Each structure stands twice: as structure tokens, then as C-alpha cells.
Amino acid sequence: MKKSLLSLLCLMAALSGQAQTELSGKSLLGGLRARHIGPATMSGRIADIEVVNRKPTIIYVGSASGGVWKSVSAGASFRPIFDDYTMSIGKVTLDQNHPDTVWVGTGEPWVRNSTSVGTGVYKSVNGGTSWEFVGLKDSERISDILINPKEPNTVYVGVQGHLWNANTERGVYKTTDGGKTWNRILFIDENTGCADMEMDPKNPDILYAAMWSHRRYPDFFDSGFTGTSGLFKSTDGGKTWNKIHNGLPTTTLGRIGIAAAPSNGNILYASVESKDIKGMYRSTDAGANWKLVNTDFNNGVRPFYFSRITVDPKHDSILVKCAFTPIISTDGGKKFRPIQSVHSDVHAAWIDPNNTNHILLGTDGGVDESLDQGCTFKIRT
């Protein structure tokens, strides 16, 4: 019996050693190609949506930890196009004059405790078939990317920065050579990053940047903790910046979302978090003055998780605010109605410039589509 047991143990040891030898090195996969299969706990959460305006059947979505996906069938099906790179996505931006040029900022900017990190900015010139890393490796989270429509090699990146600690690679960065080199053009301090940006629809040298100091800890989140959050404007392509706070809360500010009306650059909307008031502000003079227009629940709930505003391309009084329950206004933000029958937690919205009744929403559950200005929605994916 002892001999049999000893023989069995020797055989198992030999097989174990053989298995370890066979499974080591490149022989493990041979000619097979590995693909990303997880973890998938948050990968369905949509962080951003971009659509080719002249051909809205082509849709790109960036997800929290699932990479970038592309549809050429108006959302009937999607395929992954970024699986060899960082899975956490913050922003996808298209050069609408050359829509095969796609910029991706990695690192989800919606900073709940389940968020994952990015590794900088990537660029494709063939619709996502191949990608090139173009910089800002230590950015960790990118909130926005803006392209100068008159000079497509001039690109601005809003770097939100590290969530759990201070870092210096944050603020607003600019390239004038398509990503070969970068200059930081707006920096507050190592705790304050850029949460959102906007470009004037007629003059690309006019820029807006929402700067945000924030820090996450294991047991709580601190928004605006250094008192350096604020809204800034440049009229010279980022060479100089001025704070534009007239009419905004005078107490400590937190996260701010900013949007300009594509049909009228003087009309701006800002979703503002402060210590005493959270709400929607409106400017009719390109940010010189602001007026509080709405303090509904979904205009202030969880600003670290929802802050984007999308303005109708043709009507400056129609806007969608991303929120726990998304809301839409048709009177410049005075009143909002909830958008029902969609998955809760909406982070991105797109309004078709050719048919403004056509709306896409990016939610924690995927992509939803409306053809009647948000009255009804159907799930696309």
C-alpha cells in the first residue's frame, strides 16, 4: 500500500512539473491572440458618445472600463476597436471635417470609487483601425478634448488628473502639431485639474475651462477642498486666462460643467456645485455675467458623477443635462422635464445637428436612442 501511494505521489509530482514546463513562456498561447475578458464589473458604463455628424450611422462610445466601441449601423451593433490599449475611457473626440481622425482620452472622469485609470491620449487617422499613443501618460483621467476646426492639428486636452493623490500633470494642455508635442497652458496647482472645457462655435481661440480640486479617500470624497475650483476663459487660444465668476456662488466651488450653444456662442450654460447652492446657471454675454436659473434635484445631484450639458445645435434654449435621471429643458433652463424609460445614471448625450429630435444617451446600462426629442427611448445596446 505504501509503495503504491509513494508511486502515485511521484507520478503526480512528475506530471505537475511537466505541466508547468509546457505552460510556461510563449508556448502557453502559441499562435493564439489574447483578448480582454475582464474584470467586467463596470465596463458597461458609458463615459462618452461621439457621432459623425455628416453620417450619423457611425457612432463611437467610450466606456468606464470596456474600451472604445464603434458602430457603422446607427447602433444596431457595435464592435470593440481599442482592446489592445487602456480600457478606461474619458473622452472620444472626432475631427468632424476629417471624421476618420479620432482622439481618445483615457481614464474615466466620473470619479466614484469604482473608477479606473488611464494612460494618456491616443489618436487614430483611420477610423479606429490602428492607434498611436501621443502623450500625457501620467494624466490618469482626461475629461475633454477639443479640436480647432480651422486648424485640426491644434488640439486642447482637459486633464483631470489623479483621484487619490496630488500630481502635476493636470490642467489644460495644447498641441499645435497633432500630438507630437504638448504645452500646459492652464495650471492651478497639483490638486486642481480640468473637469470640462468648451470652445466658442465661431471663434476657436475663445476657450472655457472648468477647473476642479478634488480628492477621493477610502471612506469619503472631498470636492473643492483647496478652494481653487473655478471657471476660466481665454480669448487668445489659451495664452492668457481670466476667471469669469460674476453671478456664480461666492462660497467654495466644486465641479462645474460648461456648454456653449452651437447656434449662439454668447449663450452659455454651467452646472455648478458649491457649498450652499447646486444648480444650473446661464449666461447671455459669453460668460461675463451668470444667472441662476434652476436648482432642481437632477441639476445638483452627485456632481462628481454627472456634470455634462448638451445644447441643441439649432436652438439655444434647448438643452439636456446628464444626471441620475436625465432632464431636458426647452426654455433656457428655467424648467426641466425628466427623460423617462432610460437606464438611470446618464453621463453623455448627443443631439443630431441634422435632426434635433434625434438624441443618444450614454448611461450606466448602455446607449439609448430617441427620435422624438426625448419623449420616448429605445435601447440600442
Language-model segment annotations:
Residues 1-22:
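Bacterial Sec-dependent N-terminal signal peptides
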Residues 20-381:
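Beta-propeller blade termini and top-face loops
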